[in-house]
Amino acid sequence: MTVASSNTTADEFLSGKLLIKQPRNGYRAGIDPVLLAASVNAKAKQTVLELGCGVGVASLCLGYRVPDLHLTGLEIQPALAQLAMENAQYNNIQMDVVTGDLAVLPQGLKSCQFDHVIANPPYF
């Protein structure tokens, strides 16, 4: 992963345990997704769906804390979904990222069941 570009920054989360590439402008992840991840009582082997995963911070923080989760992120913006995939790969955390709209759930997710479903809606 290229650490940063003119359009992105590389930011540390969990005291530097995760390096996350995110857009330089617009919504930027901060402490909220970290706290969201900390609030999920997930256990190894469970499944987690993050709605509107953005660049993947909440899921990746959760995946770091609880190894061996099956993480899936749903993101409507293709550029953010791509960054989420890159962030998962760079941080060695298995995460499937689906580009799609919650209002029109992608076919592959319609038949899935999850132990936990999380969301961290942005606010401005």
Residue ranges and their predicted role:
Residues T2-K43:
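Class I SAM-dependent transferase core
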Residues S39-F124:
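Conserved SAM/SAH cofactor-binding pocket of Class I
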